[in-house]
Amino acid sequence: MSEISQAQPDYNYKVVRQFTIMTIVWGIIGMGLGVFIAAQLFAPMLNFDTPWLTFSRLRPLHTNAVIFAFGGCALFATSYYIVQRTCQVRLFSDKLAAFTFWGWQAVIVLAVITLPMGLTSTKEYAELEWPIDILLALVWVAYIINFFGTLVIRKVSHIYVANWFLGAFMLTVAILHIGNSMAIPVSFTKSYSLYAGAVDAMMQWWYGHNAVGFFLTAGFLGMMYYFVPKQAGRPVYSYRLSIVHFWALISLYIWAGPHHLHYTALPDWTQSLGMVMSIILFVPSWGGMINGIMTLSGAWHKLRTDPVLRFLIVSLSFYGMSTFEGLEYLPLAAES
């Protein structure tokens, strides 16, 4: 970020704007759907005796809309913006960028059609059937190629810390999605998981937990490491702490999935490992929160007038506080 070129590069802002607009659109739809199905809990007649309007079919659509449509479009938009600005070069491929936009919207629209129809793999956060999974994987691989291709052709020597988190989130989500979605198709709209029993449960929550850990945490931390310093007009509080934060987060988070499967058929050692990692995770999480908030050192006065900065700091504060949830495993640790 310290290296500023004299000539303004010709960035691809079109795809950034497209994803930003769809972030707003899908956010409204996804959260509106959440309000609707929440209302069904006290007024079941709101399903109007229509199968595709029942809670059990709309709830997966709500989670997919908020996580992958709303959150996904936000991540695409900001990562494409950040990688261009920090590398001072246009995206590696405009065609790949366009493919990721239209491909991602196609995945979302197909989810909107199939999930209310009851066409689902039954795996939480991975409900989409195998043809859509393949399309999603193709879009994601194109996304990875475009992002890392841009890093390769960058005009600055340094890879800014935000790109570390964004790159880690992309690679890990690819591995998680492909690994967990391995299935045996029996028709165009139905398949069965390649795994069975406790192994299937372990694969599912290795994916499910780390969808939160990398899609909704590492990716958004990449946003934080760019936009908080940018909005505050200050450098990152501690670059050394950001390095520790990065490696600690990606080293610990991937192991915590078994905490979704306590007191199940999963081997005890696996459950214990997930429990311990869940407790330890508050350390890198608080490191990131402190690094983000302390970046405002010398610029606290901007909170009075800058609403964007207020939202960023409040989100960091709630991120830090939410990590105390991991301490609920302390009684289990005592039992062990």
Regions found by a protein language model. Name each.
Residues 12, 57-59, 301-304:
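Helix-boundary and loop/linker segments of multi-pass membrane transporters
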Residues 2-12, 141-159:
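Cytoplasmic juxtamembrane interface segments
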Residues 293-305:
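Alpha-helical transmembrane segments
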Residues 1-17, 45-52, 192-200:
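Extramembrane terminal tails and long inter-domain/linker segments of multi-pass membrane proteins
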Residues 335-336:
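Flexible, glycine/threonine-enriched loop-and-boundary segments that flank and lead into catalytic domains
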Residues 17-45, 52-119, 130-151, 163-188, ...:
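Hydrophobic cores of alpha-helical transmembrane segments in multi-pass integral membrane proteins
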Residues 53-59, 124-125, 197-205, 269:
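Membrane-interface segments at the starts/ends of alpha-helical transmembrane spans
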